[in-house]
Amino acid sequence: MQALSSRVNIAAKPQRAQRLVVRAEEVKAAPKKEVGPKRGSLVKILRPESYWFNQVGKVVSVDQSGVRYPVVVRFENQNYAGVTTNNYALDEVVAAK
């Protein structure tokens, strides 16, 4: 006697149903408020261990990504290594008058 298989194999094509997709309107993000001094402004350095402590320099750029020392300042005079720029935190610079 031969056993019959009870499994049925039907090869059917998948049905392509039309789908209605509804997307909500994207909310435009408010522009982020810029932090720090403006580029080109003069700032006084408040970091005591800096070569340029209490001196005035010009802001080259301010990084808005949230790094620790976002303010790049360029000075007229150079330090012992011949460097004229340095990075400072927002609380280490104040606008010069």
From Swiss-Prot:
Biological process per Gene Ontology, one example term: photosynthesis
Keyword Plastid: yes
Membrane protein topology class: Peripheral membrane protein
Location, primary (coarse class): plastid
Keywords linked to the UniProt accession: Chloroplast, Membrane, Photosynthesis, Photosystem I, Plastid, Thylakoid, Transit peptide
Record Pfam families: PSI_PsaE
InterPro entries xref list: Elect_transpt_acc-like_dom_sf, PSI_PsaE
Transit peptide: 1-24
Disulphide-bonded residues: none
Keyword Signal: no
Gene Ontology, cellular component aspect: chloroplast thylakoid membrane; photosystem I reaction center
Cellular location(s): Plastid, Chloroplast thylakoid membrane
Subunit structure of this chain's protein: Interacts with ALB3.1, which is essential for its insertion into thylakoid membrane.
Similarity comment text for this entry: Belongs to the PsaE family.
Job description of the protein: Stabilizes the interaction between PsaC and the PSI core, assists the docking of the ferredoxin to PSI and interacts with ferredoxin-NADP oxidoreductase.
The protein, known as: Photosystem I reaction center subunit IV, chloroplastic
Species the sequence originates in: Chlamydomonas reinhardtii (Chlamydomonas smithii)
Lineage: Eukaryota, Viridiplantae, Chlorophyta, core chlorophytes, Chlorophyceae
